[in-house]
Amino acid sequence: MTGMESGENLENMEDILARHRKENKDLQNKITGMKKQATKSKRKEVNSKCLDLQDKLKTKQENEIRDWKIANNEVFDAEQEDEVTPEKLLEQLSISRDEKEQQNVPVQQQQQGQTKKRRNRQKERLAKRDAAIAKMKEEAALEASKQPDLKKMEQESIDQLCELKKLKQFDIQPDGHCLFASILDQLKLRHDPKKLDQDMDVMKLRWLSCNYVQEHRDDFIPYLFDEETMKMKDIDEYTKEMEHTAQWGGEIEILALSHVFDCPISILMSGRPIQVYNECGKNPELKLVYYKHSYALGEHYNSLHDS
């Protein structure tokens, strides 16, 4: 049984809202620190990162509240028990009439009848609550079915951007190495092959990016904020995992490799302007495309070739 299904493991709404207030306060403190530490050249990237962190936290908190309302069996009790409805008024009138009719009935029989009515009313309340929960789940499922096809919308938007920029998407295997494989493909395509190490591969690119991060720690502090724990990541643990595993690469690795190869790296994506890292790089620009919704495994990078 999951935490959402088990009443014992559920937070109450007061706990959730208190946690959300703390998360918002912690994030605001981190954002303030990130902006103070950002250099002038990194200010635009840091501001974009801060907005992204705020959007993700807001969405996460809204989803938690919605899920709690759907799954928590107590959500209807306090609100609906105190609500005066026509049905409850009729029920009360019926109870009063029955009590008058039973005035001449032996006390024992009256008590048995009242106990039975109390049990029936409890059963009715439980039935109403279960019906309300079922209705909420149906409405949530209906709402989900009305959501737009994000994968289709994203792909159509990227196709249009590529056509406008005279680029075509070159498929890279969707795994944890996709960013590095895309950059490797771009290096072979757009840089002088004579200057590229013959043994260059995704693992070598991982090592190069991690080595650069270690040598320029202060430049990467704004990017090391963990959205799940709301704390800064340990840079040594981060680079160790990134170098030796198939961990997905992202902004940190793109920025690092743009400096390693002294070239701009541009990221085309749906719904946002093209993001360019190290715009002042002297070597030819490397061009990638980023997908958020199009692949089952999650976020993905492909290489962009000229059409």
Swiss-Prot record:
**What organism, scientifically named, is this protein from?**
Saccharomyces cerevisiae (strain ATCC 204508 / S288c) (Baker's yeast)
Query: Annotated Gene Ontology MF terms?
Result: cysteine-type deubiquitinase activity
Name any GO cellular component annotation.
cytoplasm
Biased region (Low complexity) positions are 103-114
Which PANTHER family does the entry link to?
Answer: DEUBIQUITINASE OTUD6B (PTHR12419:SF10), OTU DOMAIN CONTAINING PROTEIN (PTHR12419)
Region of interest (Disordered), ranges: 23-46, 96-130
What's the protein called, per UniProt? OTU domain-containing protein 2
Name the CDD domains on file: OTU_fungi_OTU2-like
Which intervals hold domain OTU?
A: 167-307
Q: What else is known?
A: Present with 172 molecules/cell in log phase SD medium.
Matches recorded under PROSITE patterns: OTU
Q: Which domain of life is it from?
A: Eukaryota
